[in-house]
Swiss-Prot record:
InterPro entries with a match to the protein in the record: Cry1Ac-like_dom-VII, Cry_V, Galactose-bd-like_sf, Pest_crys, Pest_crys_dom-III, Pest_crys_dom_I, Pest_crys_N_sf, Pest_cryst_cen_dom_sf
Disulfide bonds: none
Note: Toxic segment of the protein is located in the N-terminus. Encoded on an unnamed plasmid.
Task performed by this protein: Promotes colloidosmotic lysis by binding to the midgut epithelial cells of many lepidopteran larvae.
Family: Belongs to the delta endotoxin family.
UniProt-listed GO biological process terms: sporulation resulting in formation of a cellular spore; symbiont-mediated killing of host cell
Name used for this protein in its record: Pesticidal crystal protein Cry1Ag
PANTHER family (UniProt xref): ENDOTOXIN_N DOMAIN-CONTAINING PROTEIN-RELATED (PTHR37003), PESTICIDAL CRYSTAL PROTEIN N-TERMINAL DOMAIN-CONTAINING PROTEIN (PTHR37003:SF2)
GO molecular function: signaling receptor binding; toxin activity
Length: 1176
């Protein structure tokens, strides 16, 4: 040190205000095993040991999950709390630490079980234990990770979130690789693999999003703000982004062997020099541009340092850097001068030695220089010297010292990644660049001379300088940019910057060094994102090797996310002709102005099966499994139409770039399979082109059924059946398989796929009725409940996105009449067909029905196909059932002849002639109902399972029922009173006072007049000169009389009076008295009541069926239909005792009469009022 009497004091650097050691609330992160140490160790482990197995599992235990306690997890939280100046509330902190502790305990059990299983992989008990441990671990992680994303604390919890996400992905990779050996079925393994690929994207995007949010939060205008901003960027790159950049390697089907990944991003240390108060005002905007712009990786060759002097003090005044490109040979590049040239001493050149500079020890110096008396002082803040240490895995290399060694150690902020070896071998980063910003500030009284802001820029130690391509691993290589190709900042999850090209042309070249024999063959894969379809061309040493079409992955203007990138390769393998070769990549056949991004180029040994090949192999196996032989002549019987659709989806989703020819060939085969499936399907219109389109063929159904186009579950049309509010009006769908299409003594099967259903009843009806009730509570969807269903760019279902696979173990087959188990996606029912007599035309009815309010169903891919000929016991059984059915038919015909004769006589008696166009004069409503009841005693007119389907006696029933309808119509035509039975309440009636219409227990609506001042009336138009029969059925309670009066404006009044009968009263014009009515009621079976002739097409059917060939005699009782009235008949109960029917003759003199109802005392109850026109 110079002896200068004007030097007042010297302040050591470690006494200066340093934002690095500022703490929140007095807390301080302890040195040693810090979150950065742990994250660096984990990243080094992931880069070097990324191979599934017990070694990887136990490695995670050793690094984190087996040694961490609450204090270590709390250190992760404190780290970000300090950086963003936000404390996590106690509840969120305790919840996070508790969850992490639980995961740690559970993973240690998982790891020990894994170790034991790997030592004895065929042991059934250990395989079962691994299944249990995996399910427990996966469930715990699925539950815990969302709790590490607490609202308002996403940033401070981010590093522990990433640690848990990394653990989850590793566990899912384990089951994807080893699940089959543990005993999981293929569908479960595929489902967990789909979870893995989905969560790689979800966890990546979440981490990058909240990293950027935190980074924006710590930005400020001054130099001290920038220091904290840079610290957040550096430390969360190490604890978050570096780990996230390796998430994609967990895709076990894309990276099935060891993969060499490289982190090419750069991070900055804290400024080696900064002014003593740490707050250059407004300097952040000047400092940030000094952060090196996006670039491809290069190698630091040398630093030439210049020395200047001020007031007798020598210091680092400037420097120049030279670098060499990585991945190709080229001239050394010299960067412009940082700072200023100095001539106080010769320039000192720090040359690259060994594995590069891994450590710097800098000596900053602050001096306050007193210039005489007064305030005119100077402050000098300079770098007095630096020692540069060189990395080596074997020996200690001598360091190079510029002037002198200092105390500011770069390892304090970026420590080694392996503390088990000396830092020269366990280093985590190498020096790649040294930017510098200098400033001299002046004032009237104060001079700050030559103040410097100097940063050390480092790149990860795993970055390899020479693009070595071995034979046993997947290598991700670096690139050289070409004119019109630029380097842009990576989106945060790529581990470095990426290439961008807006127009066609050459994108990149790289030199690769081959350590394997030149006979080794490779395939190229590219991780890319772009806004347009294009064509990639590749070549080696000028020799073209690949050409393929690639498709857009994102829309113009959208942000780069993990889902924007795809990794796709070429199908044609190649080999290198030289040990050092130049690989080139170019893009063509797209319009300028689009965005083309390249993240990395991968070289994969040709023997490795990766995702596109796996997809092709799976599609090929799926197509081949559809057929009975290699010549594709016939389909396998167990291959469903739904499964053919799913196989076609596999084919359609194959990569055009990778296997276009194979895709076209497989497409033709699967189309052939679909045509064969259609040919063997005996159902008409299985694709639901329409319902009720044709009367004599195809599907018939209720009007509330909807046909919908394909979705993520169904490739073709499917139907949706909704619930009903009345079981007598069910939702139904049916079709008949004609007898002519069936083979004698053959078994047939109905099958299909149900996306979800409740209370869906399925019937097959031939010689016997087969029923199945299926409930599938939404498990048919191919997407997890918590995951949104992916869609294409035009809103169509994206069937190529990861989803659940078809699982044959979920099939449900119901035989011999039993009900189907719940939660079945595939259903099937078998039915045996006997002799196919075309004269009988029995056929087979296929029925789907829902009769409950909560019922619903979505189903498709329906098939009815021949299964096998009946032989042996099955043949004998169906012949026995056939004989019983014929015996029943003979007996039914004999019974029907008798019942038909009686019913026809009752119907004929209603009319005056065989033309059935005029009723007998004395025909009343009771007689019509009585005849209707006898018509409905004809059995097997309609199927009891669904009353809209005609049975064997449908023709004669319809014949007589039509005449009953005619009788009702003729009766209505001659009864001129509207709503005389009060079935529609008080409609058409005028009311004064208080009256009610009540429905009584016998299902009759009656008018109740409870007060003497009340009156009900109706004006009726009549034909003057014609005769009418006023007829009233009523009941009087209590004292007094009930009166029904018919009158005109002037005189001509008649009335019917009702009282509580004590003695018989005879009215001159009455046709019925109190005593007479009982006889009349008995004659017609008590059928006289209000009627409902609505046509209901859907009865309810009990779900309990006898076994298939159980005897059921027609004479022992029919299968009753509780909705019998749906064809116009209702088994009305008789009138209660006390009701009286009275009538008289009336001849109006005008065209209007009034009917008035009233009473004098008590209550008057009126069942019906009629005014019947006399026949001429």
């Amino acid at each position: 040190m110079d002896n200068n009497p004007n030097i007042n004091e010297c302040i050591p650097y470690n006494c200066l205000s340093n934002p690095e050691v500022e703490v929140l609330g007095g807390e301080r992160i302890e040195t040693g095993y810090t979150p950065i140490d742990i994250s660096l160790s984990l990243t080094q482990f992931l880069l070097s040991e990324f191979v599934p197995g017990a070694g990887f599992v136990l490695g995670l235990v050793d690094i984190i999950w087996g040694i961490f306690g609450p204090s270590q997890w709390d250190a992760f939280l404190v780290q970000i709390e300090q950086l963003i100046n936000q404390r996590i509330e106690e509840f969120a902190r305790n919840q996070a630490i508790s969850r992490l502790e639980g995961l740690s305990n559970l993973y240690q059990i998982y790891a020990e079980s894994f170790r034991e299983w790997e030592a004895d992989p065929t042991n059934p008990a250990l395989r079962e234990e691994m299944r249990i441990q995996f399910n427990d671990m996966n469930s715990a992680l699925t539950t815990a990770i969302p709790l590490l994303a607490v609202q308002n604390y996403q940033v401070p919890l981010l590093s522990v979130y990433v640690q848990a996400a990394n653990l989850h992905l590793s566990v899912l990779r384990d089951v994807s690789v080893f699940g089959q050996r543990w005993g999981f079925d293929a569908a479960t393994i595929n489902s967990r693999y789909n979870d893995l690929t989905r969560l790689i994207g979800n966890y990546t995007d979440y981490a990058v999003r909240w990293y950027n949010t935190g980074l924006e939060r710590v930005w400020g205008p001054d130099s001290r703000d920038w220091v904290r901003y840079n610290q957040f960027r550096r430390e969360l790159t190490l604890t978050v982004l570096d780990i996230v950049a390796l998430f994609s390697n967990y895709d076990s089907r894309r990276y099935p062997i060891r993969t060499v990944s490289q982190l090419t991003r750069e991070i900055y240390t804290n400024p080696v020099l900064e002014n003593f108060d740490g707050s250059f005002r407004g300097m952040a905007q000047r400092i940030e541009p000094e952060y090196r712009q996006p670039h491809l990786m290069d190698i630091l060759n040398s630093i030439s340092i210049y020395t200047d002097v001020h007031r007798g003090f020598n210091y680092w005044s400037g420097h120049q850097i030279t670098t060499s490109p990585v991945g190709f040979s080229g001239p050394e590049f010299t960067f412009p001068l940082y700072g200023t040239y100095g001539n106080a001493a010769p320039p000192q050149r720090i040359a690259q030695t060994g594995l590069g500079i891994f450590r710097t020890l800098s000596s900053p110096l602050y001096r306050r220089i007193i210039l005489g008396s007064g305030p005119n002082n100077q402050e000098l803040f300079v770098l007095d010297g630096t020692e540069f240490s060189f990395a080596s895995l074997t020996t200690n290399l001598p360091s190079t010292i510029y002037r002198q060694r200092g105390t500011v150690d770069s390892l304090d902020v970026i420590p080694p990644q392996d503390n088990s070896v000396p830092p020269r071998a366990g280093f985590s980063h190498r020096l790649s660049h040294v930017p510098m910003l200098s400033q001299a500030a002046g004032a009237v009284y104060t001079l700050r001379a030559s103040l410097f802001l100097l940063l050390v820029l480092l790149i990860h130690a795993r970055s390899i300088f020479n693009n070595i391509i071995p034979s046993s691993q997947i290598t991700q290589s670096f690139k050289k940019i070409i004119s019109w190709t630029s380097v842009v900042k990576g989106p945060g999850f790529t581990g470095g910057d990426i290439l961008r090209r807006p127009s066609p042309g050459l994108i990149s070249t790289l030199r690769v060094n081959i350590t394997a024999p030149l006979s080794q063959r490779y395939r190229v894969r590219i991780r890319y994102a772009f806004t347009t379809n294009l064509q990639f061309l590749t070549s080696i040493d000028g020799r073209p090797i690949n050409q393929g079409n690639f498709y857009a992955t994102m829309s113009s203007g959208s942000n780069l996310q993990s889902g924007s990138f795809r990794t796709v390769g070429f199908t044609t393998p190649f080999n290198f002709s030289n040990g050092s070769s130049v690989f080139t990549l170019s893009a063509h056949v797209f319009n300028s102005g689009n965005e083309v991004y390249i993240d990395r180029i991968e070289f994969v040994p040709a023997e490795v099966t990766f995702e596109a090949e796996y997809d092709l192999e799976r599609a090929q196996n799926g197509v081949n499994q559809l057929f009975t032989s290699s010549n594709q002549i016939g389909l396998k019987t167990d291959g469903t139409d739904y499964h053919i659709d799913q196989v076609s989806n596999l084919v359609e989703c194959l990569s055009d770039e990778f296997c276009l020819d194979e895709k076209q060939e497989l497409s033709e085969k699967v189309k052939h399979a679909k045509r064969l499936s259609d040919e063997r399907n005996l159902l008409q219109d299985p694709n639901f082109r329409g319902i009720n389109r044709q009367l004599d063929r195809g599907w018939r159904g209720s009007h509330d059924i909807t046909i919908q186009g394909g979705d993520d579950v169904f490739k073709e049309n499917y139907v949706t059946l909704l619930g009903t509010f009345d079981e007598c009006y069910p939702t139904y769908l049916y079709q008949k398989i004609d007898q002519s299409k069936l083979k004698a003594y053959t078994s047939y099967q109905l099958r299909g796929y149900i996306e979800d259903s409740q209370d869906l009843e399925i019937y097959l009806i031939g010689y016997n009725a087969k029923q199945q009730t299926v409930n599938v509570p939404g498990t048919g969807s191919l997407w997890p409940v918590y995951a949104p269903k992916p869609i294409g760019k035009c809103g169509e279902p994206n069937r190529c996105a990861p989803h659940l696979e078809w699982n044959p173990d979920l099939d449900c087959s119901c035989r011999d009449g039993e009900k189907c188990a719940h939660h079945s996606l595939h259903f099937s029912i078998d039915i045996d067909v006997g002799c196919t007599d075309l004269n009988e035309d029995l056929g087979v009815w296929v029925i789907f029905k829902i009769k409950t309010e909560d019922g619903h169903a979505r189903l498709g891919n329906l098939e009815f196909l021949e299964e096998k000929p009946l032989v042996g016991e099955a043949l004998a059984r169906v012949k026995r059932a056939e004989k019983k059915w014929r015996d029943k038919r003979v007996k039914l015909e004999w019974e029907t002849n008798i019942v038909y004769k009686e019913a026809k006589e009752s119907v004929d008696a209603l009319f005056v002639n065989s033309q059935y166009d005029q009723l007998q004069a004395d025909t009343n409503i009771a007689m019509i109902h009585a005849a209707d009841k006898r018509v409905h005693s004809i059995r097997e007119a309609y199927l009891p399972e669904l009353s809209v389907i005609p049975g064997v006696n449908a023709a004669i029933f319809e014949e007589l029922e039509g005449r009953i309808f005619t009788a009702f119509s003729l009766y209505d035509a001659r009864n001129v009173i509207k709503n005389g039975d009060f079935n529609n309440g008080l409609s058409c009636w005028n009311v004064k006072g208080h009256v009610d219409v009540e429905e009584q227990n016998n299902q009759r609506s009656v008018l109740v007049v409870p007060e003497w001042e009340a009156e009900v009336s109706q004006e009726v138009r009549v034909c003057p000169g014609r005769g009418y029969f006023p007829r009233v059925t009523a009941y009087k309670e209590g004292y007094g009389e009930g009166c029904v009066t018919i009158h005109e404006i002037e005189n001509n009044t008649d009335e019917l009076k009702f009282s509580n009968c004590v003695e018989e009263e005879i009215y001159p014009n009455n046709t019925v008295t109190c005593n007479d009515y009982t006889v009349n009621q008995e004659e017609y079976g008590g059928a006289y009541t209000s009627r409902n002739r609505g046509y209901n097409e859907a009865p309810s059917v009990p779900a309990d069926y006898a076994s298939v060939y159980e005897e059921k005699s027609y004479t022992d009782g029919r299968r009753e239909n509780p909705c019998e009235f749906n064809r116009g008949y209702r088994d009305y109960t008789g009138l209660p005792v006390g009701y009286v029917t009275k009538a008289l003759e009336y001849f109006p003199e005008t065209d209007k009469v009034w009917i008035e109802i009233g009473e004098t005392e008590g209550t008057f109850i009126v069942d019906s009022v009629e005014l019947l026109l006399m026949e001429e």
